[in-house]
């Protein structure tokens, strides 16, 4: 049965407008962006199949272009719609952080960093430069490593922060193929960078790790040196 023949309260778009986004499944949200299915599948059936194939909506959004385009029912137009939805979310979060509206909420910071780093095939290290009011001045990936490690130069991080006149920093990196649990090397880098920042009156306020399926904040979890 085509979606247009469903009861109004079950159609994704009508359900979204009537009950709100929280009442929609990942497949229903994705179906709204896909708009149409295939000859044998409705948009929701196609969305469910894609999510099952990749394991989650997050995994689908992080997958390489060629992998998604190889899926039955996904052509350049549908893939462009998926990318546009992801970019719209990124830009919304970016605008929130640049006006200081989101940095008082750790979830907003984690969401922003997650959208920036999830999908990177290699480990990368990024820095968010902030002013005294927690407005985002600059976000930049400073270092790119291999599949499971990334070398970081603390002096370069400090020079980068000073060049943007930052008074506060959040650092972030990803674990592209594992969970977000900090490694011993992660903890040591955080401690050394915090100590270096303190020497020049620069506040390191968090270290965020984006894992394969979750995001961890040192500050939110009171991990050293933020305990």
UniProtKB/Swiss-Prot annotation:
Keywords: Hydrolase, Metal-binding, Metalloprotease, Protease, Zinc. Residues 102-224 form the MPN domain. GO terms for biological process: proteolysis. GO terms for molecular function: metal ion binding; metallopeptidase activity. Gene3D superfamilies: 5' to 3' exonuclease, C-terminal subdomain, Cytidine Deaminase, domain 2. A motif (JAMM motif) lies at residues 173-186. Zn(2+) binds at residues 173, 175, 186. It holds the Pfam family RadC. Belongs to the UPF0758 family. This is UPF0758 protein Pcryo_2119.
